[in-house]
Amino acid sequence: MKERLDNLRKRLVEVEKEVENPNLIKDVAKYKETMREHSYLSKLMEEYDNYLSIEKQIEDSKLLIQEESDAELKEMAREELHSLEAAFEKSEADLKMLLIPPDPLEEKNIIMEIRGGTGGDEAALFAADLFRMYTHYAEMKNWKYEVLSLNETELGGYKEITFSISGKYVYGSLRYESGVHRVQRVPETEGSGRIHTSAVTVAVLPEAEETEIEINQEDLRIDVMRAGGPGGQCVNTTDSAVRITHIPTGLVVICQDEKSQIKNKAKAMRVLRSRLYDLEESKKQAERAQNRKSQVGSGDRSERIRTYNFPQNRVTDHRINLTLYKLDAVMQGSLDELIDALCIAAREEMMKAADHHLEHK
């Protein structure tokens, strides 16, 4: 580990020279990447210096215990050694964690897609509930959200809804929400009081900037049509709805919420760009993971990740076996306990992988 950290210290010196270069600012993408690396390496070296300082203090304390004849001073040195060893253990764990390079995607804004699955109207109603849950959470975090596409049912549910959330560390917080969310409750439309089980699929995509993914216009088929409302009726007399098909991948995006065709096209392109970016990132992630399957962050959208049981006021996350009896608060956007637990579990998995890597180096 020390050899790797010493090499990274040399790299920091190189990066500092790059930062001092006045021409760096001319290349915005390179500037951002360099500043991100500088920030990461500076933080890493600060912890490494702390680690080396504690290591030296431990050596000094051991030497003092060995050579000191005064019993009282010897006991004081032993006590100090005990606290230093605990601090050393923590610093070593922090270093291992820091040695896992930060995922640049974590700082990104997101596009979230929620689709009603099995359960018909009840699934669509729960999709609307999840949308409200996430937007309440966004408001608590002072994030902004914008609906990009919506397909509403006559009962006020959503067959599907696509929206963006922008703010600080959005993808890092919500990336583990991708998957199947199962709900168990008595539907409002159910007269007999029987509990029904429905499912909703959530996809969380890091929002791609225009410079990050190139889309050739000849790869797109753009159709315009009249916007439809609940039950299929036309709600617009002009051809403002836009459907974009990306021919190479077969991805289709429809936006019809704006009265302007130009605005709908711009929104559809945002969604398409992020879906294509997500496809690329998923391939890279699969290559990196290869033999290591992450329980927390697999992002498999067909995986059942959470159950919301309304009669018992219970929410269970199946990936980390966490159950909370505060579903009412969760549905109002109190997601921190769930999200923090998922992030900690993912970090622990990464630390185990880092330990394995260091052991077999």
Swiss-Prot record:
Post-translational modification: Methylated by PrmC. Methylation increases the termination efficiency of RF1.
Ranges in a coiled coil: none
Principal location class: cytoplasm
SUPFAM superfamilies assigned to the protein according to its UniProt record, in alphabetical order: Release factor
Residues that span the membrane, as ranges: none
Pfam families to which the protein is assigned, alphabetical: PCRF (PF03462), RF-1 (PF00472)
Compartments, as annotated in UniProt: Cytoplasm
NCBIfam families on file: prfA, PRK00591.1
Gene3D superfamilies according to UniProt: 3.30.160.20, 3.30.70.1660, 6.10.140.1950
Classification of source organism: Bacteria, Pseudomonadati, Spirochaetota, Spirochaetia, Spirochaetales
Gene Ontology MF terms in the entry: translation release factor activity, codon specific
Keyword line: Cytoplasm, Methylation, Protein biosynthesis
Function recorded in the entry: Peptide chain release factor 1 directs the termination of translation in response to the peptide chain termination codons UAG and UAA.
Record-listed N5-methylglutamine modification sites: Q233
Species in which this protein is naturally found: Treponema denticola (strain ATCC 35405 / DSM 14222 / CIP 103919 / JCM 8153 / KCTC 15104)
SMART domains associated with the record: PCRF
Family the UniProt entry places it in: Belongs to the prokaryotic/mitochondrial release factor family.
GO cellular component: cytoplasm
Region listing for Disordered, in residue ranges: 282-310
Name under which the protein is recorded: Peptide chain release factor 1
